[in-house]
């Protein structure tokens, strides 16, 4: 293409993404948009088409972002090229959203006509505003009997401050309003700015590993043009490669001769090493490089850590490969090797939240067929010692001796919880039980309230979300951001089985709830650990003080079965002999801890 053709094509490109709270219908809307623009034949169409992982389709949530190019003939008779970048809505996957938005000029904001605005709707809108996107409100599910589009329209104006007078009323399920949405995209979303003659700048917003073609980078071209055969350089790592193919997604990968300004597509360059392409990096030409890289997005820091260990220790290297491949596709995952006396060799992994942790675990078990044991999740604590030094602890078993600790600080989050009026009391109770501090309460309208609390992250990690949902019948929605560290009275609790410490069961807990927590765990382990041939004491200790104890009784054979008659000395001899044997066994016996016991420690309720 020459310069004029490229400029004309650029003016017809529209890049947009769809943002919404979970379950407000954005994957269905994406399906309808694909149908409307005839991206696929009827035969290829299936529900939640862009959710390509089995896991996504099963749970009905979007985890990965996805990109697709569509051709749309608008009412003005012109052909437009639309790039739809689908995004997840769950709070753990905000980084996926921020990456999608960095590649767009506009966003469709989907709001459920019955439920109205929810916490993550707001969080995603603020992300979109940070990226200066044009936001088009769409009120979805208007065919529901409980829909109240006018109230929701008012809410969008009051809470978010967007002009909702032209908001499209739609039902993705019934296919109502899809054309209006496409027309609004063409009219209101600006065409990409950039110059195809400038030095090349492409932003990598995702990548995946193909065993035949190496690493495939998903890119958005900001300036310049990239063709097959070009020599390109990754600006962060300085590595150079020759481009073997470029193309777009129509959802299938379709090869093209070149990608130019505004295009969203993929680039393969026989990149074998996973570490050479970093999401957020800029690709430029090796011969005529750009002066500086694009402003990538900030690296997200993991908030939750846990240990992953293969049940079969021979598969340690397979687990490393699995984590490396997932890291490529999931820029927020971090991991490093660690060892545990109880579990052998494994990895300490960092995640954005509990859902993220569960998803990674499931993906390893499904896609790589590795059975895992996971340890209790923990957050990063700052420990200040009496000798003036300080250290960072992300694994409870690294916590120093209590005598040497001056103070411990833990991360706090500011949680915004949106909830119907009737459940305000229930939510406040949960937050107080989780050591939360009340900050603020605002009424959105007659029926809904936003509560703001400061809560320690470690309390949210356990089961905060589950409790919130079950005590508000699923109506509460919640979003959080890190605000920093504050001192807390924290202690490390160890679990001893048969007087031996099991390092994988250690956890850090607030001093006030230590006793109750210890008692619950000890009882729980008593149920879950199978009975042995000798009796096994289970103790919860803080330092050298035992705070709770329970005993698993020994299994024993009835040694008196063959005695008839009543001679007590004969029976006594047999019983004493048995007791002696049990005692010997106890001194050498070791106790196997089943995986359920580790899981129970995770899922433990404080009540």
UniProtKB/Swiss-Prot annotation:
Subcellular location: Cell membrane
Domain tr-type G: 11-193
Glycoprotein as UniProt keyword: no
Membrane topology qualifier: Peripheral membrane protein
Key words, A-Z: Cell membrane, GTP-binding, Hydrolase, Membrane, Nucleotide-binding, Protein biosynthesis
GO cellular component, one term: plasma membrane
Main location: membrane
Molecular function via GO: GTP binding; GTPase activity; ribosome binding; translation elongation factor activity
Coiled coil feature spans: none
Amino acids binding GTP: 23-28, 140-143
Enzyme class: hydrolase
Gene Ontology biological process terms, A to Z: positive regulation of translation
Catalytic reaction equation(s): GTP + H2O = GDP + phosphate + H(+)
Keyword Transmembrane helix: no
EC number from the UniProt entry: 3.6.5.n1
A Pfam family reported for this protein in Swiss-Prot or TrEMBL: GTP_EFTU
PROSITE patterns, per database record: G_TR_1 (PS00301), G_TR_2 (PS51722)
Source superkingdom: Bacteria
Family statement drawn from the similarity comment of this UniProt entry: Belongs to the TRAFAC class translation factor GTPase superfamily. Classic translation factor GTPase family. LepA subfamily.
HAMAP family: LepA
Protein name in UniProt: Elongation factor 4
